[in-house]
Amino acid sequence: MAAQGFLLIASFLLILLVLAKPLGSGLARLIAAVPLPGVAGVERILWRTLGITDHEMNWRQYLLALLTLNLLGLGILFCLLFWQEWLPLNPQRLPGLSWDLALNTAVSFVTNTNWQAYSGESTLSHFSQMAGLTVQNFLSAATGIAVVFALIRAFTRQNVHTLGNAWQDLVRITLWILFPVALIIALFFIQQGVPQNLSAYQPITTLEGAKQLLPMGPVASQEAIKMLGTNGGGFFNANSSHPFENPTALTNLAQMLAIFLIPAALCFAFGEAAGDRRQGRALLWAMSFIFVVCVAVVMWAEVQGNPHLLAAGADSSVNMEGKETRFGVLASSLFAVVTTAASCGAVNAMHDSFTALGGMVPMWLMQIGEVVFGGVGSGLYGMLLFVLLAVFIAGLMIGRTPEYLGKKIDVREMKMTALAILVTPMLVLLGSALAMMTDAGRSAMLNPGPHGFSEVLYAVSSAANNNGSAFAGLSANSPFWNCLLAFCMFVGRFGVIIPVMAIAGSLVSKKVQPASQGTLATHGALFIGLLIGTVLLVGALTFIPALALGPVAEHFSLP
């Protein structure tokens, strides 16, 4: 079993690197604002049609453009969901969502979280899925990538005040990266058996003679961008454990690769844009090391099995509870770590049914800020925040002003870095405390003791870090939970983006200093170790007390 697990991990990472490197070169061209081959003429027509100029923006203008787009999308999506019953392509005549659920869902998809407090097949029409959720899957992914483009330009430019044109970046990212890759993935899913239609639900008679209603809809198109954009919101309630979303072992592998594809490619793009590919590889090595260790721990925990089930006479020594037999324990464990290392949140198994330690690792990966590959764009700019913190710590140890890629890291950058890193831990800890202190929060818990607290902690961690997965034993569709998690999702997204853009605005105006003998090399094994240590240290100091009350206490309570 151990050999199979490591072979699965190695094969997955090898295929990922082969696919990510050429995509990284394309992303690097977009960072440099160089049109991809053959599309320059198309872009000129688009700019004239859309009224987009070549005028570059400073960080405030760039940020304002992104906030305007996202707030407008939030309002439109809320209206689509709230008045769903009056809109077309609703063959099941599903009613509109309540105001709190519509708000929660709109915030969720605009912030790239895709937390779902509803069952998709019994709540949303085809129109809501296509015109509402799928559109936001593209726009939220493009927003994250645009932010990291601006931050990368801040390191590669000097003595200027502009970071590019947000509207051009958003259009290029959507049309030349997200759409074509998502189209290829969607066609593959259709070939594998994923539905893509606008039909009403189909009544059938099962082998036992019972009547059943099979949900239909444009599943493949939404599934593709759901994974590629690290969105994660399922067309069906069971998400990627549903055979209509993830029917085969091949689609399961393709979904995991799609989740990591752009985050890994952005590391290569960062190295090319910085003029030193070793810089991007260093970040990729750091992410990969943490990822492999986490996958190994989850696989080990799930292979050990659940003592309660073993004592009850379960016919399997491994923990197959909540897992699909067509995937098995190893592929389910790998998927769980992939989806929580990235801010995706799609699931092919129920994380609530994992062992205590097996469920703790995905929770902790979210809590450290979704920086192990992370979401599209957000993972890299989150890791770059830890890079700035690591060079600051190194500068304190050797008595030098910290710098990264030749840019001096001053007080302003460190204040913004600290703010961005502290936003999500504060939301997680304060939000969990509020839920446990109120009757409205506790009433949603379906399990007592440490596991019940773990469900609450997981939900708030998922929302604040824009992941979207859940320990399903929490009845979260209530005004209290919908409003609390909507607030966490919104602040967790834009409360990080705003200081990141402020850092970019500060760095882009600085001169690149030539390296000297005392300059810390940020591409070697020493710095990779320092970066990993910084990520682990922040995660450990912040969340060990909370984890001790939840999954750790649950683990030690097992026989």
UniProtKB/Swiss-Prot annotation:
Q: Does the keyword Protease apply?
A: no
Q: Which InterPro entries match?
A: KdpA
Highest taxon above the source species:
Bacteria
Indicate whether Cell inner membrane appears among the record's keywords: yes
Looking at the UniProt record for this protein, which Gene Ontology cellular component terms does it annotate, in alphabetical order?
plasma membrane
Where does the chain cross the membrane? 5-25, 27-47, 63-83, 132-152, 170-190, 253-273, 283-303, 327-347, 356-376, 379-399, 416-436, 484-504, 524-544
Q: Which UniProt keywords apply?
A: Cell inner membrane, Cell membrane, Ion transport, Membrane, Potassium, Potassium transport, Transmembrane, Transmembrane helix, Transport
How is the protein disposed in the membrane? Multi-pass membrane protein
Q: Name one Pfam family in it.
A: KdpA
Query: Where is this protein found?
Result: Cell inner membrane
Can you name one GO molecular function term for this protein?
P-type potassium transmembrane transporter activity
Alphabetized PANTHER family for the sequence: POTASSIUM-TRANSPORTING ATPASE A CHAIN, POTASSIUM-TRANSPORTING ATPASE POTASSIUM-BINDING SUBUNIT
Sequence similarity: Belongs to the KdpA family.
**What is the stated purpose of this protein?**
Part of the high-affinity ATP-driven potassium transport (or Kdp) system, which catalyzes the hydrolysis of ATP coupled with the electrogenic transport of potassium into the cytoplasm. This subunit binds the periplasmic potassium ions and delivers the ions to the membrane domain of KdpB through an intramembrane tunnel.
Assembly mode: The system is composed of three essential subunits: KdpA, KdpB and KdpC.
Record HAMAP family: KdpA (MF_00275)
What name does UniProt use for this protein? Potassium-transporting ATPase potassium-binding subunit
Q: Which organism is it from?
A: Salmonella choleraesuis (strain SC-B67)
- Taxonomic classification, please? Bacteria, Pseudomonadati, Pseudomonadota, Gammaproteobacteria, Enterobacterales
Give the encoding gene's name: kdpA
